[in-house]
UniProtKB/Swiss-Prot annotation:
The gene is aroQ. Homododecamer. This is 3-dehydroquinate dehydratase. GO terms for molecular function: 3-dehydroquinate dehydratase activity. It comes from the Bacteria. Belongs to the type-II 3-dehydroquinase family. It catalyses: 3-dehydroquinate = 3-dehydroshikimate + H2O. It comes from Cereibacter sphaeroides (strain ATCC 17023 / DSM 158 / JCM 6121 / CCUG 31486 / LMG 2827 / NBRC 12203 / NCIMB 8253 / ATH 2.4.1.). Catalyzes a trans-dehydration via an enolate intermediate.
Length: 147
């Protein structure tokens, strides 16, 4: 069994820490990776972080994860509400999937309240800031270890 967890991030998350810090905070995607790697290492796992502004690139990473990852943490960002392609790719992945959002999407515009990804996710975290990623990694570690 692989002990790698894929952490996939969608559009505009490359600007984390710069774009709308009042919503998303001041920490960067590099901070997310560092914090998640530390949590995973405590449990004997590793992480592979990927970000793209392109839907097909995210789908390709999910396909790769079928062979290379025990679980996926995904923040599809705007694709949460629009991407059947990402949902279909996740449906082809057999391991656990946790959907993670930095902000509380249910407290924001109504179009953000619907998630295609939630139809596949084993759990959803929203509104915990980047700490949500750490919580998601802990849960994936537990699920991958049989818990």
């Amino acid at each position: 069994m692989t002990t790698t967890i894929y952490i996939l991030n969608g559009p505009n998350l490359n600007l984390l820490g710069q774009r709308q810090p009042e919503i998303y905070g001041h920490e960067t995607l590099a901070d997310v990776e560092r914090r998640c790697a530390a949590v995973a290492a405590e449990k004997g796992f590793s992480v592979r972080l990927f970000q793209s502004n392109h839907e097909g690139a995210i789908v390709d990473q999910i396909h790769e994860a079928r062979q290379a990852a025990c679980g996926i943490v995904i923040n599809p960002a705007a694709y949460t509400h629009t991407s059947v392609a990402i949902l279909d790719a996740l449906n082809a992945f057999e391991g656990p999937v946790i959907e993670c959002h930095i902000s509380n999407v249910h407290k924001r515009e109504s179009f953000r309240h619907h998630s295609y990804v939630s139809l596949r996710a084993d759990g959803v975290l929203a509104g915990f800031g980047i700490e949500g990623y750490e919580l998601a990694v802990r849960r994936i570690c537990s699920l991958c270890a049989g818990g």
